[in-house]
Amino acid sequence: MNMNSLSVSRVLADLAGKDFISCSDFTSDQVKALLQLSSQLKNGDRRIDLGNRVLGLIFSKASTRTRVSFQVAMARLGGQTIDLSNQATQLARGEPLKDTARVLSRYCDALALRTFGNDELIEYAKWSSIPVINALTDLEHPCQALADFLTIKEAFGSLDGITLAYIGDGNNVLNSLMICGTLLGVNIQIASPKGFEPLPSIVERAKTLAHPTLKICVSNNPIDAVSGAHVIYTDVWASMGQESEQAQRKEIFEGYTVNKDLVDKAEKESIILHCLPAHRGEEITDDVLESSASRIFDQAENRLHVQQALLAALLGGL
């Protein structure tokens, strides 16, 4: 579905002032309109001015792509960002979160949180009177998913009939891929080692959002997962906060590396995605990451464009 600027604005009008905790907060049409707006902004077909509005960044985890893309997105939209990490505020000295959230709502126009616990994000959303954006928690990474599906749409021209294979840990990135993918009509085929599959509750939640003809398949076999896949997606085997498990996970995930042999078993014109940072030689080989099938750096760039679109919608800039 391609919409003109007026149609996009109409579909996204109801998002002004809302939180973005998960892609399931939006309708299928709203997610599609966000991707369309992202393309318009990327191609220079749309100009938006947020008029010096301020985005507060509360990041408890290290970040390159998420932090910088939000900073650049606000700058390009005529706004600005400020760093509000917990250690830089009175939260570090015990001020209740609900007090901090209400005060920040008087100074900022939106907050983007990157935190270990999803509960903290929900608490900010509860007490803030401005939009709260999920910039990554242990449960979901919805901004990443938006960028992923924009990249897939660019590669194939449409998301209709697309099958995405995810190889690796059933983590927060996969959770958002399932939820966003089902809203967009994408089939998801997953291969994870036993004990590292995605949360059944998230799988069921995604299935409730899906059209009856869509499928979400979970297995322990990477070859089964890539069969018929147009997209092969992987991520690190040990996420932030799991560094102590890295050696153990490296043994468990042996056989789940995205290498040329595995890629050759997917559709002929399949593409490769990874949200980065990558551990080359572990979840993905260097030759695959650098191959002509890789859209990994397009994917990283698209974080900027989808977050511009998201900020414009939530801050009422349309």
From Swiss-Prot:
Major subcellular location class: cytoplasm
Reaction(s) this enzyme catalyzes, per UniProt: carbamoyl phosphate + L-ornithine = L-citrulline + phosphate + H(+)
UniProt GO BP: arginine biosynthetic process via ornithine; citrulline biosynthetic process; L-arginine biosynthetic process
MF terms (GO), sorted A to Z: amino acid binding; ornithine carbamoyltransferase activity
Residues that, per the record, bind L-ornithine: 172, 235, 239-240
Family recorded in the similarity comment: Belongs to the aspartate/ornithine carbamoyltransferase superfamily. OTCase family.
Name the UniProt record assigns to this protein: Ornithine carbamoyltransferase
Protein's organism: Prochlorococcus marinus (strain SARG / CCMP1375 / SS120)
